[in-house]
């Protein structure tokens, strides 16, 4: 009888262990695949690990990203430098700084900045980062684009001027922009929304999202919709980009006391509604 009771006790223990393992695995699976920080409604988003990145390593994952823009040196006078890109403490960090580079190409001087571009292009989906913009007039930007000799399609999820010593509204402005260009005809269609915050965007972390479907583009900030437009032009697979640039003809170059800063990105996440359309980044 004692042995039988022991056997029953062992069986019960194993059953509990199996239930515990199953429950634990179920919870783990749910936590492993996050949902977009945005109203979902009836849409079903499928998380894509191949394109997403939590930046948990000690260096940039070069199977996913370039540490530069392969087709552009940066907006003059600021020069993109791979040395200004690093992964540290669970973040991708892009640095902009006041710096002279002795062998810089003509037109590049005074400032260096950073760019990270995906090695794949994707068509449609939900794109999201959690970040803290740079406290500088060297910009922080999250954008998608593709170009060839004929046209350029571009969706700027955000561009932020984190500091402006004479125009205090700039650091509170989140520019959400769309561009479509036919180079051979000199055509450039561009529109934007300037979404305002009560305080500068650099003072807190921001969750920035974009829903891009065949029918529409929708921009989100911290889960709130800030812009929606019909998708008239953006039907080509595009690269994913994070960068920092100096803008001499927009809000102006950094002041003499602005020596740059860091654009810190905690994660980048991508979801598709169906099978994702993923292509090699072959831009030239």
Task: Write out the residue ranges for each language-model feature.
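Bacterial N-terminal signal peptides that target proteins for export
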Residues: 2-14
């Amino acid at each position: 009888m004692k042995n039988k009771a022991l056997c029953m006790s062992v069986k019960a223990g194993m059953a509990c262990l199996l239930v515990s393992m199953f429950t634990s695995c179920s919870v783990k699976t749910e936590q492993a695949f996050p949902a977009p920080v945005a109203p979902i409604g009836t849409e079903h988003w499928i998380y894509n690990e191949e394109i997403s990145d939590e930046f948990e390593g000690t260096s940039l994952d070069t199977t996913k990203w370039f540490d530069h823009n392969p087709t552009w040196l940066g907006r003059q006078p600021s020069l993109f430098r791979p040395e200004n890109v690093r992964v540290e403490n669970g973040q991708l960090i892009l640095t902009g700084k006041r710096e002279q580079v002795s062998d810089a190409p003509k037109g590049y001087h005074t400032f260096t900045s950073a760019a990270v571009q995906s090695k794949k292009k994707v068509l449609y989906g939900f794109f999201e980062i959690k970040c803290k913009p740079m406290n500088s007039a060297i910009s922080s930007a999250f954008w998608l684009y593709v170009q060839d000799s004929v046209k350029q399609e571009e969706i700027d999820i955000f561009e932020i001027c984190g500091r402006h010593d004479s125009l205090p509204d700039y650091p509170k402005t989140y520019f959400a922009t769309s561009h479509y260009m036919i180079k051979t005809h000199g055509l450039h269609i561009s529109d934007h929304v300037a979404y305002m915050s009560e305080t500068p965007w650099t003072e807190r972390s921001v969750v920035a999202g974009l829903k891009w479907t065949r029918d529409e583009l929708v921009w989100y900030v911290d889960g709130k919709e800030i812009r929606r437009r019909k998708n008239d032009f953006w039907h080509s697979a595009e690269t994913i980009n994070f960068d920092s640039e100096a803008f001499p003809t927009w809000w102006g170059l950094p002041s003499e006391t602005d020596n740059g800063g860091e654009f810190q990105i905690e994660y980048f996440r991508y979801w598709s509604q169906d099978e994702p359309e993923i292509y090699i980044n072959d831009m030239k």
